[in-house]
Swiss-Prot record:
Enzyme nomenclature, EC number: 4.2.1.59
HAMAP family per the UniProt record, alphabetical: FabZ
Biological source species: Ectopseudomonas mendocina (strain ymp) (Pseudomonas mendocina)
CDD domains: FabZ
Main subcellular localisation: cytoplasm
Lineage: Bacteria, Pseudomonadati, Pseudomonadota, Gammaproteobacteria, Pseudomonadales
A biological process from GO: lipid A biosynthetic process
Protein name in the entry: 3-hydroxyacyl-[acyl-carrier-protein] dehydratase FabZ
């Protein structure tokens, strides 16, 4: 498990763009991670998306999955951003949205390592709420030295 303080060591993002609240399962040997994002009505994006019928923007669900995948990548490599390495989200394949994410939901983020080649990493990701899949995608990240 990782609390928010340890997560901040592995992700360079900060409020309001840090979208992983807690890591509940991290299996470096099995190359997978499970984390949570607690979705509050106080999220700044709900002011405009949409005030009368708030739903979490899909691009932020994708970003949350990418951040969970980034933590897994850092842990697999045994490095942190402070060591001079970053993972940039560069694309996705097989992206599907299945259900809206609403204020009060707890988003479960899962990522599994698929491959890496020439500093391009691929992860199979999914996001669920109460066990129901709301989004899935293959997330592609580029590893870059600073």
């Amino acid at each position: 498990m990782m609390d928010i303080n340890e997560i901040r060591e592995y992700l360079p993002h900060r409020y309001p763009f840090l979208l992983v609240d807690r890591v509940v399962d991290l299996d470096v040997e099995g190359k997978q991670i499970r984390a949570y994002k607690n979705v509050s009505i106080n999220e700044p994006f709900f002011n405009g998306h949409f005030p009368e019928h708030p739903i979490m923007p899909g691009v932020l669900i994708i970003e949350a999955m990418a951040q969970a995948a980034g933590i897994l990548g850092f842990k697999m490599m045994g490095v942190k951003p402070a060591d001079g390495t970053l993972y940039y989200f560069v694309g996705s394949d097989k992206l599907r949205f299945r259900s809206p994410v609403l204020p009060g939901d707890q988003l479960t983020l899962e990522a599994k390592y698929l491959s890496d080649r020439r500093s391009i990493w691929k992860f199979e990701c999914r996001a669920t709420v109460d066990g129901k899949e709301v989004c899935s995608a293959e997330i592609i990240c580029a590893e870059r030295k600073l």
